[in-house]
């Protein structure tokens, strides 16, 4: 190659390139993208001519094959080439063999491939067939190739690199200090990067860059990915806004339905009140003698009448149960002496004079009709456990307040009379005590005579019941 006349080679090589331009790969270079400028076309032509002159026909054929593989025109072949390059790289990086071992293996593989090729296809027949086809036919690609070829990509990259070098030279002339600082920073960065990352990894990154950059550059994958991501983001944005509006509408509709349902439930409950089965059973089980007649009142409760008798305020049938209930509940209250003693002893424990008996009887007789009316009115309504207790407590409170007011008035009148008159003599006190003793003895003798005469058991029980009730009231009033 080191001949003294390089111009001849140049003149001989240039026509060869011009003659070889009708090859199948070269017209594709002329059909570049519409966006490529004339400078890129000229640079691509110069690169192809230089490669043809320097490397020759076989190397140029390999370059075309590499162009097809790296431009990913045929994705399957490009993918297989990518996998093969990765396997070869890691085999060379991890194998313990020496360099000459690898060279010998490569030569041996080449020889085997050539032998197989000669055995399968005759060289002469193949050459003759190829000549006949190339002379009589010309392969034309009917599909216009809109993707830029690898030569265009290389030419564009070379132009960008040359522009970068021109700008850097201009920057060096304008500010040499900043340029020196920038170069030192870049060198320091790569030094630190090489100390932390092995050279094998950097070489593998260069291999990936060589395969993937043409893929993204020639096929406009970046622009396609950007357009798809943008459309997805727009759909997502619109979908989120629509979803929020739909949720708001559903919430407002649910609130309207809930308010309408509450209003309908209120109207329905007002028309048809609910009745508890337990309360109805208690109301039906009030009467023990006859079947009770159930009637519906205005306030939504049951009205019971015992034995089909008319309900009047002065009915004896209603007075009798009220007295029985009152006496039964009074017998359950505890008393201090459990009914022992006499009525006189209870009256003495109160400290009230005997003259108050008639006044108490008058007050009791005055309050009895009102109590009877209350008891009759209470039985006309359904008697629950809480209502019965409330009624009994009201009756007991009325009796106690009446007795207390009478006792306080009498005590005040007695105190005024005592202040107005002189103090009583000791003889009078002894007379009153003897009179009280006589009355106590007389009452005890009467009780003994009644027990000896053998009164009926019912009368004795009634007497005992009256003693207990009077004893309870007297003890309660005495406590106050």
Swiss-Prot record:
Q: Name one GO biological process term.
A: collagen catabolic process
- Keywords recorded for this protein, A-Z: Autophagy, Endoplasmic reticulum, Golgi apparatus, Membrane, Phosphoprotein, Transmembrane, Transmembrane helix
Please give the residue ranges the record annotates as the region Reticulon homology domain. Answer: 67-216
Superkingdom as given in the UniProt entry: Eukaryota
Subcellular location(s): the record lists: Golgi apparatus, cis-Golgi network membrane; Endoplasmic reticulum membrane
What ranges does the record give for the region Disordered, renumbered to this chain?
Answer: 1-41, 302-348, 450-480
Question: Where mainly located?
Answer: Golgi
| Phosphoprotein found in the keyword field | yes
Q: Which residues cross the membrane?
A: 44-64, 79-99, 102-122, 192-212
Which molecular-function annotations from GO does this UniProt entry contain? endoplasmic reticulum-autophagosome adaptor activity
Q: What post-translational modification information does the record give?
A: Phosphorylation at Ser-134 by CAMK2B enhances oligomerization and membrane scission and reticulophagy activity.
- Report the membrane topology from the UniProt record: Multi-pass membrane protein
**Which Pfam families does the UniProt record give?**
RHD_RETREG1-3 (PF24456)
Motif LIR motif: which ranges? Answer: 436-441
Q: List every position bearing Phosphoserine.
A: 132, 134, 136
Keyword check for Thylakoid: no
Biased composition regions of type Basic and acidic residues, renumbered to the chain:
1-10, 317-331
Q: Which InterPro entries match?
A: RETR1_RHD, RETREG1/3
Q: What does this protein do?
A: Endoplasmic reticulum (ER)-anchored autophagy regulator which mediates ER delivery into lysosomes through sequestration into autophagosomes. Promotes membrane remodeling and ER scission via its membrane bending capacity and targets the fragments into autophagosomes via interaction with ATG8 family proteins. Active under basal conditions. Required for collagen quality control in a LIR motif-dependent manner. Required for long-term survival of nociceptive and autonomic ganglion neurons.
Read off the PANTHER family from this record.
RETICULON-LIKE PROTEIN, RETICULOPHAGY REGULATOR 1
How is this protein organized at the quaternary level? Homooligomer; oligomerization is enhanced following endoplasmic reticulum stress and is mediated by the reticulon homology domain. Interacts with ATG8 family modifier proteins MAP1LC3A, MAP1LC3B, GABARAP, GABARAPL1 and GABARAPL2.
Q: What is this protein called?
A: Reticulophagy regulator 1
Task: State the organism's lineage.
Answer: Eukaryota, Metazoa, Chordata, Craniata, Vertebrata
In the UniProt record, the gene name given for this protein reads Retreg1
């Amino acid at each position: 190659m080191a001949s003294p006349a390089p111009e001849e080679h140049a003149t001989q090589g240039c026509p060869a390139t011009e003659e070889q331009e009708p090859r199948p790969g070269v017209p594709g270079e002329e059909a570049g993208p519409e966006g490529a400028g004339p400078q890129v076309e000229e640079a691509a032509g110069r690169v192809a001519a230089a490669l043809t002159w320097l490397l020759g026909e076989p190397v140029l054929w390999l370059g075309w094959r590499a162009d097809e593989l790296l431009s990913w025109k045929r994705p399957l072949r490009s993918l297989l080439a990518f996998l093969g390059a990765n396997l070869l790289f890691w085999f060379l990086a991890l194998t313990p063999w020496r360099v000459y071992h690898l060279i010998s293996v490569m030569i041996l593989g080449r020889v085997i491939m050539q032998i197989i090729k000669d055995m399968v296809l005759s060289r002469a027949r193949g050459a003759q067939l190829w000549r006949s086809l190339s002379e009589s036919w010309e392969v034309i690609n009917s599909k216009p190739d809109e993707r830029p070829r690898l030569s265009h990509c290389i030419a564009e990259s070379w132009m960008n690199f040359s522009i970068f070098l021109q700008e850097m030279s201009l920057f060096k002339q304008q500010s040499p200090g900043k340029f020196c600082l920038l170069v030192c920073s870049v060198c320091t960065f790569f030094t630190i990067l090489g100390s932390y990352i092995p050279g094998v990894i950097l070489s593998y990154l260069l291999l990936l860059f060589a395969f993937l950059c043409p893929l993204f550059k020639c096929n406009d994958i970046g622009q396609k990915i950007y357009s798809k991501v943008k459309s997805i983001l727009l759909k997502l944005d619109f979908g989120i806004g629509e979803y929020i509006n739909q949720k708001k509408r559903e919430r407002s509709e649910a609130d309207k339905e809930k308010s309408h349902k509450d209003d309908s439930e209120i109207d329905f409950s007002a028309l048809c009140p609910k009745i508890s089965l337990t309360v109805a059973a208690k109301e039906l089980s009030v009467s023990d003698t006859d079947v009770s007649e159930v009637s519906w009142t205005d306030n939504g409760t049951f009205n019971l009448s015992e034995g089909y008798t008319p309900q009047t305020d002065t009915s004896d049938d209603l007075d009798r149960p009220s007295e029985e209930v009152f006496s039964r509940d009074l017998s359950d209250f505890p008393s201090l002496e459990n009914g022992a003693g006499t009525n006189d002893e209870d009256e003495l424990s109160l400290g009230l004079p005997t003259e108050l008996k008639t006044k108490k009887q008058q007050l009791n007789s005055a309050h009895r009709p009102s109590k009877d009316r209350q008891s009759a009115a209470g039985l006309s309504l359904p008697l629950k456990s809480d209502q019965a207790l409330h009624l009994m407590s009201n009756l007991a409170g009325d009796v106690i307040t009446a007795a207390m007011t009478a006792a306080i008035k009498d005590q005040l009148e007695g105190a005024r009379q005592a202040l107005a008159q002189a103090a009583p003599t000791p003889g009078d006190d002894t007379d009153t005590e003897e009179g009280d003793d006589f009355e106590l003895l007389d009452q005890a003798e009467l009780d003994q005579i009644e027990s000896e005469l053998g009164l009926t058991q019912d009368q004795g029980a009634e007497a005992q019941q009256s003693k207990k009730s009077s004893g309870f009231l007297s003890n309660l009033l005495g406590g106050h």
